[in-house]
Every structure is written in C-alpha cells, then in structure tokens.
Amino acid sequence: MNKSQNSGIVEQFVNTVMGVKPGNKSQSLNTSIATTQELDIKAVLVYTLGTILQILVMILVLLGMEKLVMFIDNSSFPSWVSTLLAGLFFALLSIRSRIFSLLDNTRSRQTYDQVIRPRWSPPPLAFPIVWMTIAVLRVIYSVLIWQQMNHQFLVLPLILFVVHLALGDTWNTIFTVERRLGAAVPVVILGPWLSAVVVTAIYWQTNSIAGMTLSFSCVWLTVAAVLVFRIWQLNGSEPLYPLKLTLVDR
C-alpha cells in the first residue's frame, strides 16, 4: 500500500468520524446569489431562533443526563458506569452537537475547496483532523469538570460549553452551508471564538487542567478566525451581514 493510498484511507476515516462530506469541484457552490446590499432579516431571525432552540434542547438533555446519572449512582451499578456514560455523552456532544440543531449543519469541504484562500491556509484535511483532536480533548475536560461538579450536568461551565457548541454550529451554517463570507467574519469572532475564551476562563477557575486542555481550541479558533477574515478579503469583501439572496438557475 503506497503513501497516497494510506493518506486516502486516513482522510476517509477522519471525514467519516467527523461527518465531513468531500467537496465536489464540478458542483455549483449554491443556487442563490446576492443581488442587493439589503439585510436578510429573515436569515438573522432564523439563525438567532435556531441557535436559541439548540441551546435550550441541549440544556434539557443535560438535565436528562443528570437525572439518569443520579439514578445510576444511587443504584447498585459499579462506579465506573456513570463515568463511562458521561464520557460517551460528551463524545456525542463534541462530535455531533449539530444533531440538536434545526439549522442545516451539513459538514462539507465544498465551500473551503472553491473559495480563494491565502497561501498559508491549511489543507482541507487538516480541519477534520484538528477538530477530531479537539473533540477528544473536549471529552477529557468535560468529564473532569463533571467530576469536579459532583456528577452534575446542569452547571454553569457545562451550560456555557453547550452554548459554545451551538454558536459553532450556527457559524457552520452561515459559512459552510450558505457561504455567507461576510456574515461569517463577525459571527466567528463573537460566536465560537469569544465563547471559547469565556468557557476556557470558567473551566480554568473550576479545574486548571481542564482549562489548560481547552486553551488549545482557543489557539485553533484564533487561526480559524484570521483565516475566515482573509478568505472574506480575498473573495470580494461583501458586507459583514447576511445579504438577501435570490434563487438563480445554474
């Protein structure tokens, strides 16, 4: 098996785990274009309500997990059962938090493959690999926080964590799915990046090891935010808000 075959297997494995669909360069990027500079108020409302609903659903799931683990801890199950269950739950949240979102959160390389990128931009495969690494770290630091909080899920650090995940999913909808390169700039800064900084600070106060582990994602999101900004600059610098789109025939 040659090097390229090994690389292909690794890429397929990583993309499968992270749910990333490979880009198709022959496929049109989307069937809508902005013909005016008018703010798409409907899109803003959809993003806002979609994010809020996802956060509420995940908070309810946290509550459900707390009740389930409380039952397990008060039963005759071995002590490791609740820890294993918590780890699996945080793994699901870290890799597939988008299942709780009503928005289209398809993970695809299509946008990244087709836009103009700076020379220093990482190769497309780097993103799912890095995010898979971050997902593993998320499981570790979330379990640490959960243990620090006496097996409680409905606590401030974990609530802020699911808020961070929801904001990241909404950004994915804006950038990857709908290719709104302008709106993606402020959203990536005020959403995933800022929330990661806040969560890191709260985690650090609760458990310093968890805070240090989470800081890696802050570094990566800083790189990602700069990359999103440069992609916006290189692809026309459209307004930094969602533009009203018009359907076109391709």
Protein language model features and the residues they cover:
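Aromatic-rich, lipid-facing transmembrane alpha helices and their immediate juxtamembrane interface loops
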Residues: 2-250
